[in-house]
């Protein structure tokens, strides 16, 4: 089994949209977030390994656009998304968001 680096994740309630195309037509809530992925609460169906576009509504009232692939799906609950090839600007925005969350709450090791 591949050894995975442990990441700090934060419990959140961030609005998001997602989908197979960049316009990301489906909506959900991000309930946990780390530098490597998130969990999206939604009733929408996705499949394991499905590539998705994700848009997170940032505190400064703009979208953070990320790409990822579904790790697993819990039918009627939501799915885990692992972030994939994202640009330097998107990674920097995600890091800033995580730092803001770090200041607001206690992190949970995963």
Residue ranges, per PLM feature:
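A residue-level detector for short acidic-glycine micro-motifs
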Residues: 20, 32, 70-72, 85
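Residue-level recognition of conserved beta-strand positions in structured domain cores
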Residues: 42, 56, 68, 82-85
């Amino acid at each position: 089994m591949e050894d995975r680096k442990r990441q700090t994740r934060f419990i959140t309630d961030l609005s998001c949209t997602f989908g197979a195309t960049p316009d990301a037509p489906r909506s959900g809530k991000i309930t946990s977030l780390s530098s490597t992925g998130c969990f999206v609460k939604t009733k929408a169906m996705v499949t394991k390994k499905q590539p998705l576009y994700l848009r997170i509504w940032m505190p400064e009232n703009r979208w953070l656009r990320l790409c990822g692939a579904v790790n697993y799906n819990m039918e009627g609950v939501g799915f885990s998304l692992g972030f994939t090839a994202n640009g330097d600007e998107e990674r920097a925005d995600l890091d800033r968001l995580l730092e803001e969350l770090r200041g607001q709450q206690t992190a949970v090791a995963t």
